[in-house]
């Protein structure tokens, strides 16, 4: 294997996936940022969840809101539902892994909060149940998906927003998800605290 050629292929595939996504998802990123800004202005918070690399994305997003993104500004309320190992293991052990996020949402979610639900396949059962719990708690959902949107896309309500990456490879979809998360942070900061060049 020519490793340099392989790396070039991976870079090229990532660039092309981002280019293709840019052609379709920009309006959805704008809408998602506006939805989150409205929630934050109304004293709501943003809960986030996902599995594996998407768990990392959920935490990445919440830490950028809670701590900081690129500028000094007040902390913004966000909770990643992927981090409390005692809660996660006890729910999985006593009930089911499919309920690890939904049970937390039923306890922490308030009407007007937003759920950022992340899955490259759109088919992770615990993320699907998280969306159902969010709807029961009168929360709107921003879904970061890929492929055909899976079961998540079918579950979304008209007031929810899906940002679907038009790609099939999990790693490439995740690479665009991270870019979308940084776009959301940038747009949220600019809408709440004024634009910065
Ligand atoms: O990061 C990766 C692959 O790039 C993996 O950890 C991946 O996130 C896991 O297999 C997830 O369980 C996949 O779940 P999903 O994206 O289909 O919801
Ligand atoms: Zn990954």
Curated annotation (Swiss-Prot):
<keyword id="KW-0479">Metal-binding</keyword>
<dbReference type="InterPro" id="IPR050099">
    <property type="entry name" value="SIS_GmhA/DiaA_subfam"/>
</dbReference>
<feature type="domain" description="SIS">
    <location>
        <begin position="36"/>
        <end position="197"/>
    </location>
</feature>
<feature type="binding site">
    <location>
        <position position="174"/>
    </location>
    <ligand>
        <name>substrate</name>
    </ligand>
</feature>
<comment type="function">
    <text>Catalyzes the isomerization of sedoheptulose 7-phosphate in D-glycero-D-manno-heptose 7-phosphate.</text>
</comment>
<dbReference type="Pfam" id="PF13580">
    <property type="entry name" value="SIS_2"/>
</dbReference>
<protein>
    <recommendedName>
        <fullName>Phosphoheptose isomerase</fullName>
        <ecNumber>5.3.1.28</ecNumber>
    </recommendedName>
</protein>
<dbReference type="InterPro" id="IPR001347">
    <property type="entry name" value="SIS_dom"/>
</dbReference>
<feature type="binding site">
    <location>
        <begin position="119"/>
        <end position="121"/>
    </location>
    <ligand>
        <name>substrate</name>
    </ligand>
</feature>
<dbReference type="GO" id="GO:0008968">
    <property type="term" value="F:D-sedoheptulose 7-phosphate isomerase activity"/>
</dbReference>
<feature type="binding site">
    <location>
        <position position="64"/>
    </location>
    <ligand>
        <name>substrate</name>
    </ligand>
</feature>
<dbReference type="InterPro" id="IPR046348">
    <property type="entry name" value="SIS_dom_sf"/>
</dbReference>
<dbReference type="InterPro" id="IPR004515">
    <property type="entry name" value="Phosphoheptose_Isoase"/>
</dbReference>
<keyword id="KW-0119">Carbohydrate metabolism</keyword>
<keyword id="KW-0963">Cytoplasm</keyword>
<keyword id="KW-0413">Isomerase</keyword>
<keyword id="KW-0862">Zinc</keyword>
<comment type="pathway">
    <text>Carbohydrate biosynthesis; D-glycero-D-manno-heptose 7-phosphate biosynthesis; D-glycero-alpha-D-manno-heptose 7-phosphate and D-glycero-beta-D-manno-heptose 7-phosphate from sedoheptulose 7-phosphate: step 1/1.</text>
</comment>
<feature type="binding site">
    <location>
        <begin position="93"/>
        <end position="94"/>
    </location>
    <ligand>
        <name>substrate</name>
    </ligand>
</feature>
<dbReference type="InterPro" id="IPR035461">
    <property type="entry name" value="GmhA/DiaA"/>
</dbReference>
<feature type="binding site">
    <location>
        <begin position="51"/>
        <end position="53"/>
    </location>
    <ligand>
        <name>substrate</name>
    </ligand>
</feature>
<dbReference type="GO" id="GO:2001061">
    <property type="term" value="P:D-glycero-D-manno-heptose 7-phosphate biosynthetic process"/>
</dbReference>
<feature type="binding site">
    <location>
        <position position="182"/>
    </location>
    <ligand>
        <name>Zn(2+)</name>
    </ligand>
</feature>
<dbReference type="GO" id="GO:0097367">
    <property type="term" value="F:carbohydrate derivative binding"/>
</dbReference>
<comment type="similarity">
    <text>Belongs to the SIS family. GmhA subfamily.</text>
</comment>
<dbReference type="GO" id="GO:0005975">
    <property type="term" value="P:carbohydrate metabolic process"/>
</dbReference>
<comment type="subunit">
    <text>Homotetramer.</text>
</comment>
<feature type="binding site">
    <location>
        <position position="64"/>
    </location>
    <ligand>
        <name>Zn(2+)</name>
    </ligand>
</feature>
<dbReference type="GO" id="GO:0005737">
    <property type="term" value="C:cytoplasm"/>
</dbReference>
<feature type="binding site">
    <location>
        <position position="60"/>
    </location>
    <ligand>
        <name>Zn(2+)</name>
    </ligand>
</feature>
<feature type="binding site">
    <location>
        <position position="124"/>
    </location>
    <ligand>
        <name>substrate</name>
    </ligand>
</feature>
<feature type="binding site">
    <location>
        <position position="174"/>
    </location>
    <ligand>
        <name>Zn(2+)</name>
    </ligand>
</feature>
<dbReference type="GO" id="GO:0008270">
    <property type="term" value="F:zinc ion binding"/>
</dbReference>
């Amino acid at each position: 294997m020519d490793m340099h050629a392989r790396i070039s292929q991976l870079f090229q595939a990532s660039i092309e996936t981002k280019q293709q996504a840019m052609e379709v998802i920009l309006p959805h990123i704008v809408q998602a940022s506006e939805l989150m800004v409205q929630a934050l202005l109304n004293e709501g918070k943003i809960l986030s969840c996902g599995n594996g690399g998407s768990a990392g994305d959920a935490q990445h997003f919440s830490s950028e809101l809670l701590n900081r993104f690129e500028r000094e500004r007040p902390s913004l309320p966000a909770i990643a539902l992927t981090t409390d190992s005692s809660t996660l293991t006890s729910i999985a052990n006593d009930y089911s892994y499919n309920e690890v996020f939904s049970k937390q949402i039923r306890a922490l979610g308030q009407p007007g909060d937003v759920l950022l639900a992340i899955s490259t396949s759109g088919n992770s059962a615990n993320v699907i149940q998280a969306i159902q719990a969010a709807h029961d708690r009168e929360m709107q959902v921003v879904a970061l998906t890929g492929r055909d949107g899976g079961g998540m896309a079918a579950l979304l309500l008209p007031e929810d927003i899906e940002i679907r990456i038009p790609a099939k490879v999990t790693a490439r979809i995740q690479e665009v998800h991270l870019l979308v998360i940084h776009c959301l942070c940038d747009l949220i900061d600019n809408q709440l605290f004024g634009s910065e060049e």
